[in-house]
């Protein structure tokens, strides 16, 4: 059975959880979807883990289209979310062009990084049959503006701004949210306050779903792992088992634990 946005909306309504992993090719797309993971994110994180870049900024739309096509060919029924890359949402015209290319490549939804200013684009995309996932908190495409990879919403003003932006985008018709590196209490509050399902990464177990970069949860990314990462490969010794263990841990609430949150 294919997973749709309605599946994830009902999961939230019923108080259940769902899992998301990144994939960039047909082989891993198949393995991840066969493990029961509800959604696959074709992330611009491919810049880091596939291309060896130091950020996601160099990733192009053409590259995102190519990897989305690859993932779509291997997918066995998971919902496919594709990132609109750096500067892809600089104007409404660019956003529409990028969304068209990614949806025609096989995505079921596009993901935009930003804040309340995304509302107009989300409304227009919705009218044209394109569901949107809004990525808030730490937005890696803005790493140069943020001054590094830092937890967002730590002080009262930052928290209020994030919560207000989430409500605005929820009203605009956002289908899903991703909260990255947002304090646990704030992540839980946003999850309660918005109708759309919320996916966490370095956020809170109270979020409706969780996402990790595949290479991180397999323990094969270079460098020191982020606080929110758990190495499921080390626990299982097998990739298929690692994907299943991750899915199980998200759904039974054992991941993320306190040590994975801020």
UniProtKB/Swiss-Prot annotation:
InterPro entries with a match to the protein in the record: Pantoate_hydroxy_MeTrfase (IPR003700), Pyrv/PenolPyrv_kinase-like_dom (IPR015813), Pyrv_kinase-like_dom_sf (IPR040442)
Listed pathway(s): Cofactor biosynthesis; (R)-pantothenate biosynthesis; (R)-pantoate from 3-methyl-2-oxobutanoate: step 1/2
Magnesium among keywords: yes
Cellular component GO terms, alphabetical: cytoplasm
Biological-process GO terms, alphabetical: pantothenate biosynthetic process
Chief localisation class: cytoplasm
Catalytic activity, reaction form: 3-methyl-2-oxobutanoate + (6R)-5,10-methylene-5,6,7,8-tetrahydrofolate + H2O = 2-dehydropantoate + (6S)-5,6,7,8-tetrahydrofolate
Sorted UniProt keywords: Cytoplasm, Magnesium, Metal-binding, Pantothenate biosynthesis, Transferase
Coiled-coil residues: none
Binding site for Mg(2+): 44, 83, 113
UniProt xrefs under Gene3D superfamilies: Phosphoenolpyruvate-binding domains
Entry-linked Pfam families: Pantoate_transf (PF02548)
Cofactor(s) the protein requires to work: Mg(2+)
Taxonomy, superkingdom: Bacteria
Enzyme Commission number(s): 2.1.2.11
PANTHER family for this protein: 3-METHYL-2-OXOBUTANOATE HYDROXYMETHYLTRANSFERASE (PTHR20881:SF0)
Subunit structure comment from the entry: Homodecamer; pentamer of dimers.
Sequence similarity: Belongs to the PanB family.
Full protein name: 3-methyl-2-oxobutanoate hydroxymethyltransferase
Species the sequence originates in: Alcanivorax borkumensis (strain ATCC 700651 / DSM 11573 / NCIMB 13689 / SK2)
